[in-house]
Amino acid sequence: METESADIPPNQTLYVNNLYEKISKKKLIEQLLLLFSKYGPILEIVGSKSLKMRGQAFIVFKDITSASNALREMNGFNFLDRPMKIQYCKSKSDAVSKLDGTYMEKKREREENDKKGSNKKQDRKSTGQQQQQQKRPGAPTSTTSTTSPTTSNGTVSLQPRDDPPNKTLFVENLPDKCDSMMLSMLFSQFQGFKEVHMVESKKGIAFIEFEDEIKSGFAMTNLQHFKVTPEKPMVVSFAAQ
């Protein structure tokens, strides 16, 4: 394992295993966030409920320095009575790809490959239909085939609001169980953080106050689309004045 880890170059994503398995995915992510957020801004923490992936997680930092410090200090740390085993991840995460601008290139490559595969499959299907038609007595020499164009995957991209800079941030698309303590842990990583205001009358939104709009803008950039839970990327905007 040590030889394999040494062969992997340092990067922003850490692979963590030997974790306690009898803990919910939500609780695991919350606990890992508490432990690792002190090393630097975290873009994403990925866990899984599947039997194959139990006891494992991926922690995506914004920069390599933060990930390296976390690996050095937390590898072997006794977490829920089990020593964590940490190494750099072999491949770049989508979160990091979005940050450095290579995500869309990867996405286009995947879409092009999927489209090529789909076109080949459709061509084979059309050829087979034509051959079947031609075998029938009295069948026309050619047939017209109609296919539906390939649509996108339907994923909704939540965009931040286009409001002028403000020292207060408006955060939405939060999971219902997200509370002020969780948000304080996230945003207190950034200089100038003051306090969190939860909106009790409406779940899923909150206001985060900073000393000035420069500090709030830095926090917004770093935590934009951070996944508090795997299915809930939060959307951060300047609050309307």
From Swiss-Prot:
Residues 12-91, 167-241 form the RRM domain. Transmembrane segments: none annotated. Residues 129-152 have a biased composition (Low complexity). Keywords: mRNA processing, mRNA splicing, Nucleus, Repeat, Ribonucleoprotein, RNA-binding, Spliceosome. InterPro entries: Nucleotide-bd_a/b_plait_sf (IPR012677), RBD_domain_sf (IPR035979), RRM_dom (IPR000504). GO terms for cellular component: spliceosomal complex; U1 snRNP. Residues 99-169 are annotated as: Disordered. Involved in pre-mRNA splicing as component of the spliceosome. Associated with sn-RNP U2, where it contributes to the binding of stem loop IV of U2 snRNA. Identified in the spliceosome B complex. Identified in the spliceosome C complex. PANTHER family: U1 SMALL NUCLEAR RIBONUCLEOPROTEIN A/U2 SMALL NUCLEAR RIBONUCLEOPROTEIN B. This is U2 small nuclear ribonucleoprotein B''. It comes from Dictyostelium discoideum. The lineage of its organism: Eukaryota, Amoebozoa, Evosea, Eumycetozoa, Dictyostelia.
